């Protein structure tokens, strides 16, 4: 640990801030733990969609973004419905980046983005699911 900082809040609450720039085995494990005499809150940057909340003599609750039990400021910060990680936009952007490279004629990696073949295969899969259901849930082969 590179630093231990003792703090006292305006209301008299005491706390400790512990920090380390380098900790063996950790990547970027930014976390915030708030312990009180009647419960605690825990949050980790590597698992950002969960806030652990414990009140004395109650089971641990896991709070997630986008749900009505959150405060309005939290709901306003969530851009997607519950269950969708905020990073989904970055993931989609990576797919679009690969496609843009191909359109521009730049070098790109094989399988960097789905091609027409994967799109047609996905549509075939959906058609087979519906067809299987309509025929009494029989096994069907996908086109190669």
Where do the language-model regions lie?
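Glycine-rich phosphate/pyrophosphate-binding beta-alpha loops
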Residues: 18-27, 84-87
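Glycine-rich Rossmann NAD(P)(H)-binding loop
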Residues: 18-22, 35-37, 143
């Amino acid at each position: 640990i590179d630093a231990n900082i003792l703090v006292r809040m305006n209301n008299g609450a005491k706390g400790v801030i512990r920090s380390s720039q380098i900790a063996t085995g950790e990547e970027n494990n930014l976390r915030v733990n708030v312990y009180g005499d009647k419960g605690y809150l825990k949050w980790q940057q590597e698992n950002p969609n969960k806030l652990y909340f414990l009140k004395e003599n109650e089971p641990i609750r896991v709070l997630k973004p986008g749900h009505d039990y959150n405060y309005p400021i939290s709901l306003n910060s969530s851009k997607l419905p519950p269950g969708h990680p905020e990073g989904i936009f970055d993931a989609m952007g990576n797919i679009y980046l690969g496609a843009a490279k191909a359109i521009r004629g730049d070098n790109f990696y094989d399988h960097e983005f789905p091609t027409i073949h994967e799109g047609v295969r996905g549509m075939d899969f959906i058609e087979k699911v519906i067809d299987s259901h309509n025929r009494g849930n029989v096994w069907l082969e996908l086109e190669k």
